[in-house]
């Protein structure tokens, strides 16, 4: 059985926690789609193209991982790419309620697609893209939390601000 999982998010920016989860998923599933949401509801720091490029570079060494962009219902994106599993990370109990609601809605819209939760590695349980952006905005060192190319992109974004 060939199983494809889809891992959606805005990835603004992608962190080592995201990359760790994708790497672990790539050992479980035959194929992993990292799906970058265009997300017009949010005001991202990095535009859609930048987020796609940063994500692609972050997973470049993972041969069974592919990065795609989407601006549709997640279940429609999953179907388009042949994914039968939605992969979500749970950092804390506080994430559970929202993720539980989303899993129920996705199951309602796409009953053939299962949602599976992975917990982060201990080193990454506290990471979030919004916290990373805030640290970088004020000149803090984010090198332990994001890939080097993401750190450089953050530094360029915030050059002269903060």
Swiss-Prot record:
The reaction(s) this protein catalyses: (R)-4'-phosphopantetheine + ATP + H(+) = 3'-dephospho-CoA + diphosphate
Single GO cellular component term: cytoplasm
Gene Ontology biological process terms from the UniProt entry: coenzyme A biosynthetic process
The keyword Cytoplasm is annotated on this UniProt entry: yes
Localization terms from the record: Cytoplasm
Domain of life from the UniProt record: Bacteria
Site positions (Transition state stabilizer): 18
Keywords for this protein: ATP-binding, Coenzyme A biosynthesis, Cytoplasm, Magnesium, Nucleotide-binding, Nucleotidyltransferase, Transferase
Disulfide linkage: none
Record-linked SUPFAM superfamilies: Nucleotidylyl transferase (SSF52374)
Database matches in NCBIfam families: coaD_prev_kdtB (TIGR01510), cyt_tran_rel (TIGR00125)
HAMAP family reported in the protein's UniProt record: PPAT_bact
Subunit structure: Homohexamer.
The protein's name in its UniProt record: Phosphopantetheine adenylyltransferase
Organism listed in the record: Methylococcus capsulatus (strain ATCC 33009 / NCIMB 11132 / Bath)
Lineage: Bacteria, Pseudomonadati, Pseudomonadota, Gammaproteobacteria, Methylococcales
Name of the gene encoding the protein in the UniProt record: coaD
């Amino acid at each position: 059985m060939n199983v494809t999982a889809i891992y959606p998010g805005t990835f603004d920016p992608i962190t080592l926690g995201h990359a760790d989860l994708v790497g672990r998923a790539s050992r479980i599933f035959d194929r992993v789609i990292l799906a970058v949401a265009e997300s017009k509801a949010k005001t991202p720091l990095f535009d859609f193209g930048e987020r796609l490029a940063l994500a692609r570079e972050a997973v470049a060494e993972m041969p069974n991982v592919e990065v795609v962009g989407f601006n549709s219902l997640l279940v429609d994106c999953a179907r388009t790419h042949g994914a039968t599993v939605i992969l979500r990370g749970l950092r804390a109990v506080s994430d559970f309620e929202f993720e539980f609601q989303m899993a129920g809605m996705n199951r309602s819209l796409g009953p053939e697609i299962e949602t599976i939760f992975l917990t982060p590695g201990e080193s990454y349980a506290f990471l979030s893209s919004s916290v990373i952006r805030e640290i970088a905005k004020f000149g803090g060192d984010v090198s332990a939390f994001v890939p080097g190319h993401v750190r450089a992109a953050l530094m360029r974004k915030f050059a002269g601000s903060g």
